Structures are given as C-alpha cells and as structure tokens.
UniProtKB/Swiss-Prot annotation:
The lineage of its organism: Bacteria, Bacillati, Bacillota, Bacilli, Bacillales. It comes from the Bacteria. This is UPF0154 protein Sca_0984. The chain crosses the membrane at residues 4-24. It is a single-pass membrane protein.
Length: 76
C-alpha cells in the first residue's frame, strides 16, 4: 500500500509543479512584454513611412495608445 501512496504523491507533486510553473512563466512573460513591447514608436514611424504615410507624432501616439490598451485587455 505504501508503494501506491508514494506513486500518487509523486504524480500529484508533478502535476502541481507543472501547473505552478506554467503560471509563473506566464506572469514572467506578461511582465516582460509590458516592459519591452514588441513594437515601439520608431518601428511604427518606419512602418508608416513604408506605407507612404507621413507619420505625425499625434498619429503615432494614438496607435501606441491603441496597441497598449489592446495588450492590457489581452492580459486580463
């Protein structure tokens, strides 16, 4: 009977470790992406120039605000 208990405890610890590791890694990545967004103002400016638009600071600020708001909604 002790063997079954040991196996059960090992499996339970493994599952708890996997779930805990998943959530810790998820939180770390969310914080990392918030501090280092995948796109910044300079990248937006270059994209707009490549599309033939004149990048005004107002447009860039609007796009960054929109992207940050969208990112915050996805994180919740």
């Amino acid at each position: 009977m002790a063997t079954w208990l040991a196996i059960l405890l090992i499996v339970a610890a493994l599952i708890i470790g996997l779930v805990g590791g998943f959530f810790l890694a998820r939180k770390y990545m969310m914080d990392y992406l918030k501090k280092n967004p995948p796109i910044n103002e300079e990248m937006l400016r270059m994209m707009m120039m490549q599309m033939g638009q004149k990048p005004s600071q107002k447009k860039i600020n609007q796009m960054m605000t929109m992207m940050n708001k969208n990112m915050d909604q996805k994180m919740k």
